Each structure stands twice: as structure tokens, then as C-alpha cells.
Amino acid sequence: MTDERRNIRFERSCCPITCSLDLLGDKWTLLIIRDLFLGKKRYQEFLASPEKIATNILADRLKRIEANGLVIQKIYQQNPTRYEYELTQKGEELRPVLEALIKWGRSYYPGTKVFDEVETLEQEKEN
């Protein structure tokens, strides 16, 4: 166990589902993670997603997932300072979760549409 794991405080309980939902359970976080898997890295790219996340919510979620070790922030422009985001190993390990949600959603919501990029994410798993 790493020091990071030993120092975790449980917000509601020590149930792994509860702990995961405390970080990922809002309606935006997994969509941001999805976009990172699809190659989006910059703030404006996240804002351009079809779900139309508000800027204040996006800023909050990016800070939150960075603080929890799912992404790292890197400067790509100095003046004005602009950042891009990259998944960490911990963030990358959410791929099977997203793939399972795609599969489940397609099974139970047949009218849903999958973006071409999401289709690619699912096909990468099959290859």
C-alpha cells in the first residue's frame, strides 16, 4: 500500500462503491474522463463537448480530479498561462469502467447515439 492510499479519509463510509461515487458520481466527471480518453486536453476542448458543461463546473471538476490523482495539469502556454490535462495511470485505469457503461447504455437505451470517437474507444478494447 502506498502512503497515498494509507492517508485516505472516507467521506461517508469505507465501502469502495461509496468512495468511488464520492469522486465520480456526479453527472460531469466521467464525461470529462471520457473526453480525455478521446484525446481532448484543453479547457476549450472540454467546453466544446455536446453536453455543454458550464465553465465554473468544468473548472471545479478538473481541480477535483487533479487533486485526487486522476489527471495532471501541464502548462502549454506561458502568457497568458494555459494548461492542458493528461490522465495519470490511476485515471487510465477507469477505461474498463467507461467501456462497461457504453455497453450497458447501448443495451438498455437503444435510441442512444455513440459519437464516432466513443465508438473508437470501444473498438480499441476489442482489438
What are these regions (language model features)?
Residues 40, 50, 62, 91, ...:
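Short amphipathic alpha-helical/adjacent loop interface patches that line ligand
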Residues 25, 77-101:
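Basic, amphipathic "hinge/linker" alpha-helix immediately C-terminal to the N-terminal HTH DNA-binding motif
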Residues 96-127:
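Amphipathic alpha-helical dimerization/coiled-coil segments
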Residues 47-76, 80:
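Canonical helix-turn-helix DNA-binding module
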Residues 32-33, 65, 71, 85:
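Hydrophobic packing within well-folded, soluble alpha/beta domains
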Residues 15-57:
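N-terminal helix-turn-helix DNA-binding core of bacterial DNA-binding proteins
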Residues 2-21:
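Short, Lys/Arg-enriched N-terminal segment that forms or immediately precedes the first helix
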